[in-house]
Structures are given as structure tokens and as C-alpha cells.
């Protein structure tokens, strides 16, 4: 099922929003504790040559530089998913999400992010959409292939209002069934996801 591509309207794209951005600090709208843990793992991937990792962010125009590596800019558009990871035959476009709730709200993934992951996978069979998820209080984390969660997301997105009970979020049990559990402190996801994909390619079954 493919839902509509609901991109922001043109008037919103031109809106001026002053933001402060620290080099290497990540998107201030996201939980830096989770992204810093992911960044540390990704730096190791780069250092050992197992993957090339690009940290992406929203488009903006620089207005002025400030002290301590920060600057103020104008936000031009909503950004793509957080990471682009090339490893072996696969190229992953990954979005990181952290929640402090006992269930993962599907609304955390925005329309433009879901649309980007859909288009990414449609372009090439080697392209893989991925969500890197953490529930902070429960100390749980998962790597979830977009194709395994997209049905939940589009069903919620295109469903009736008010949302039926239990359909607007995912429980840890559901994430255990559709995702790959990883360490919330040292989220080394690449080998396990590649093994899962390789097993499916050779046997037709998921590990």
C-alpha cells in the first residue's frame, strides 16, 4: 500500500526559521544521546572500512557564524532521513528515533520521511530503508526495515479519525517481532541487518 506523498506546501518551504547548529552535534530537534551513540558506532564502521556513512540534515542557508562552532541559519526545507550508509551490495537510508514513552508513536515519523523511504526503496532493489529506534526508559532498541513497518505507518496515517485504540503506536512486543533488537548503548546494527537481508536473498527466509 502506498499512501499519498504529502510534502510541505510551498509557503512552508519558504518560511524563515532561525536555528542554532553545532558542527557534529546533530539535529537539535532529535535526541542527541541516541544519535551520539549511533554516530560512535558509525565512526567505527568508517574506521574499519565496513561501511561509508554520511550524516545528513535539513537544508538551510547560513546567516552568520557564532562562537564555539555554532551558527545561525534559515531553514529552507525539511531534511531527509538521518543517515546514508553504503556497505557491500546495500545502501541504507536510515532514520533515528528516540522516545521516552512505553510505546513508539507512529507520528514520530513525519510524512516527508515516510515518503522519502518509500521513494528510496523504489529506485533500486539494493536500496534499503531503515528505522533505528530506541525506547529510552525501557533501555530497548531495534533496527527495523522500513518495509516491515511501513504498513503500520500508512494504515495509521490514512486511517480514520479518531484513531482506533492501539493503532497509533507500536509496543515493544511488536517491535521485537518485526525488528532486530540491538544494544541501546552501543547500537551495532549493520552486521545483523546485512545477515538478515543476505539470508533472505539466498534462502527466501528471514533469520
Model-derived features with residue positions:
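Acidic-basic catalytic patches of nuclease active cores, encompassing PD-(D/E)XK
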Residues: 1-74, 203-205
Amino acid at each position: 500500500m502506498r499512501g499519498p506523498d504529502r510534502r510541505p506546501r510551498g509557503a512552508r518551504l519558504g518560511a524563515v526559521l532561525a536555528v542554532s547548529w553545532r558542527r557534529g552535534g546533530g539535529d537539535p530537534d532529535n535526541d542527541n544521546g541516541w544519535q551520539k551513540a549511533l554516530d560512535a558506532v558509525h565512526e567505527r564502521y568508517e574506521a574499519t572500512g565496513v561501511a561509508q556513512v554520511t550524516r545528513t540534515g535539513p537544508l538551510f542557508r547560513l546567516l552568520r557564524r557564532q562562537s564555539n562552532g555554532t551558527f545561525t541559519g534559515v531553514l529552507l526545507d525539511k531534511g531527509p532521513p538521518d543517515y546514508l550508509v553504503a556497505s557491500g551490495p546495500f545502501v541504507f537510508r536510515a532514520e533515528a528515533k528516540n522516545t521516552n514513552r512505553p510505546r513508539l508513536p507512529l507520528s514520530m515519523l513525519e510524512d516527508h520521511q515516510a515518503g522519502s523511504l518509500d521513494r528510496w526503496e523504489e529506485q533500486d532493489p539494493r536500496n534499503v530503508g531503515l528505522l533505528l529506534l530506541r525506547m529510552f526508559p525501557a533501555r530497548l532498541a531495534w533496527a527495523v526495515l522500513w518495509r516491515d513497518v511501513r504498513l503500520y505507518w500508512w494504515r495509521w496515517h490514512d486511517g480514520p479519525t479518531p484513531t482506533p485504540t492501539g493503532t497509533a503506536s507500536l509496543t515493544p512486543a511488536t517491535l521485537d517481532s518485526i525488528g532486530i533488537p540491538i544494544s541501546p548503548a552501543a547500537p551495532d546494527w549493520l552486521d545483523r541487518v546485512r545477515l538478515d537481508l543476505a539470508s533472505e536473498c539466498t534462502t527466501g527466509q528471514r533469520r
